[in-house]
């Protein structure tokens, strides 16, 4: 349960080129910079907004994390990237005004205007984004050569996050937003969601036109954005069993019925024993005696079809626990896409070697 994901309640993209267009149910979220869109237009940009339920955030912190040290990350998964610079930076801020997602899509004819856009917070002609005389600690950013708007956000230095992508780097967004989430949880600021934007905008340079597109909550793929919570739930309460200290050794995973409903919680037991146990005089078989894996042991979960990590190895947040029976870990199935198969991997350190064990242990999440 040391990794738990919640999903957005609403998201949309704001385009300076189309200042009244709403894209609330588009499958794509986009942050981009366009130069020379036509001979008469100035550089244009786009930003996206994404919001998560305050009730869900509070529930996770109060009832699941329950006092442990935790971290939260905004995760968005890339759909397409073009014209990337050698380094492109994205920024994340907490939005300072409320907004409405709407039901538009990019390119709708006629244009849908029933939700947030570059100019408006709700629908065309309703509440405009503040563009001057900002409340203390908030700001906006736009070019005088385009329509004013584009959202407003808090500018306290601690309430921000960023990520820089090198040309060959993974382009998925994975930004630590713990301080922002904490501010929402404590009601220091209202939860109006995140705004994600490029660090450099409105630059009139034909060589700087990065487009980064991410899957939205309305995607028909297995890659919706999420707010991922991680915390250390490791408990070391060892009994009389020995620890594995030498190679080779064998590992098996028990208490895996193979099928789980979304939202269920399962404790997977990890049994280990030396491949060639030392012979002793006893009546029980040496091959039935369990051992603990070293305390520096971790689990990971992969999607069986895509071979991508859904939960990656993490020395702080996916560490195995120990009780009098065995090593183990507990897993909450809430963040897993239903009707898919997943693989369990174990990583441990023995005799100074980092060993990753893939023994083809699978499970499936089903709709319940």
Residue ranges and their predicted role:
Residues 275-282, 292:
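Extracellular acidic loop/turn motifs
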Residues 195-199, 334-356:
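Internal, hydrophobic beta-strand segments that form the core of beta-sheet-rich folds
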Residues 52, 331-334:
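Hydrophobic core positions of the immunoglobulin-like beta-sandwich fold
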Residues 350-368:
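Short beta-strand elements
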Residues 1-259, 264, 271-276, 285, ...:
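Secreted, disulfide-rich extracellular signaling modules
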Residues 294-298, 342:
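Small/polar, repeat-rich beta-turn/loop motifs that tile beta-strand-dominated architectures
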Residues 326-330:
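Short S/T/G- and acidic-enriched coil/turn segments that sit immediately N-terminal to beta-strands
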Residues 289:
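Extracellular attachment/recognition segments
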């Amino acid at each position: 349960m040391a990794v738990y994901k919640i999903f957005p309640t609403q998201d949309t993209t704001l385009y300076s080129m189309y200042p009244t267009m709403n894209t609330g149910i588009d499958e794509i979220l986009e942050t981009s910079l366009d130069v020379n869109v036509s001979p008469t237009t100035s550089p244009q940009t786009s930003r996206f907004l994404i919001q998560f339920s305050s009730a869900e955030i509070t529930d996770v912190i109060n009832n699941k994390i329950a006092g442990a040290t935790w971290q939260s990350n905004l995760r968005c998964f890339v759909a397409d990237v073009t014209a990337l610079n050698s380094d492109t930076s994205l920024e994340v801020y907490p939005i300072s005004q409320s907004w409405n997602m709407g039901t538009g899509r990019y390119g709708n004819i006629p244009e849908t205007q029933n939700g947030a856009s570059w100019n408006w917070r709700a629908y065309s002609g309703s509440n405009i984004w503040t563009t001057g005389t900002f409340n203390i600690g908030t700001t906006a950013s736009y070019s005088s050569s385009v329509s004013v708007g584009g959202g407003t956000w808090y500018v306290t230095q601690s309430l921000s996050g960023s990520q820089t992508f090198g040309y060959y780097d993974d382009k998925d967004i994975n930004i630590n937003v713990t301080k922002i989430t904490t501010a929402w949880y404590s009601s220091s600021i209202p939860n109006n969601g995140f705004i994600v934007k490029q660090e450099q905008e409105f630059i009139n340079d034909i060589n700087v036109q990065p487009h980064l597109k991410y899957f939205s909550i309305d995607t028909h793929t297995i890659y919706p954005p999420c707010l991922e919570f991680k915390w250390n739930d490791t408990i070391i309460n060892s009994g009389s069993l020995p620890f594995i200290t030498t190679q080779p050794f064998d590992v098996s995973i028990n208490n895996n019925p193979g099928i789980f409903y979304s939202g269920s919680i399962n404790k997977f037991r990890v049994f280990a024993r030396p491949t060639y146990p030392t012979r002793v005089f006893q009546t029980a078989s040496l091959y039935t005696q369990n051992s603990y894996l070293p305390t520096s042991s971790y689990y990971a979960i992969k999607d069986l079809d895509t071979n991508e990590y859904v939960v990656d190895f993490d020395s702080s947040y996916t560490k195995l626990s120990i009780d009098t029976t065995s090593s183990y870990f507990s897993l909450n199935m809430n963040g897993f896409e239903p009707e898919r198969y997943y693989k369990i991997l174990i990583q441990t350190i023995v005799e100074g070697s980092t060993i990753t064990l893939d023994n083809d242990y699978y499970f499936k999440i089903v709709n319940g």
